[in-house]
Amino acid sequence: MSSLPHVLVAEDNDLVSGAMRVLFEETGHRVSTAPSIAATVSVAVADPVDLLLLDLGLADGDGLEVLAQLKERGALPRVSVALTGRDEPEVVARCRAMGCTDVLLKPVPARQLLARAREWLSSGT
């Protein structure tokens, strides 16, 4: 098992997930990507995740379903962060209720995402 922090990017847009992969790999992280709820759950169960960057609008449904399934399997990531294009209080409240450490409005500038990731990973929450 690698000592590099494992970042799982749950994103169905290949350009976005590819950019996040490069961003995190170049800054010393081990990165997995998954385009769907099923793929995200499969990766997280097989390989414990330090930071989950979770798009709420996955092609096969509500991204928060990932957290529900991982909780059932006892495989929740150390830190889960929701990424959404919807800046609505009820969306943020749902994310928090499901255990998200933070909710970021897309698009998230790369520097901001990296700075926040360092904070989340150093605190573990």
Regions found by a protein language model. Give the residues of each.
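Short amphipathic alpha-helix used as the core "switch/output" element in two-component signaling
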Residues: L64-P77
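Conserved acidic carboxylate
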Residues: E11
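Two-component/phosphorelay signaling modules centered on CheY-like receiver
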Residues: D14-S32, M98, W120
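Active-site residues of response regulator receiver
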Residues: D55, T84
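Acidic, metal-coordinating helix/loop segments flanking the phosphotransfer/catalytic sites
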Residues: T33-L51
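The feature encodes the CheY-like receiver
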Residues: A59, E88, P107
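Acidic catalytic/metal-coordinating carboxylates
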Residues: S36, D62-E65
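C-terminal output helix
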Residues: E90, V108-A117
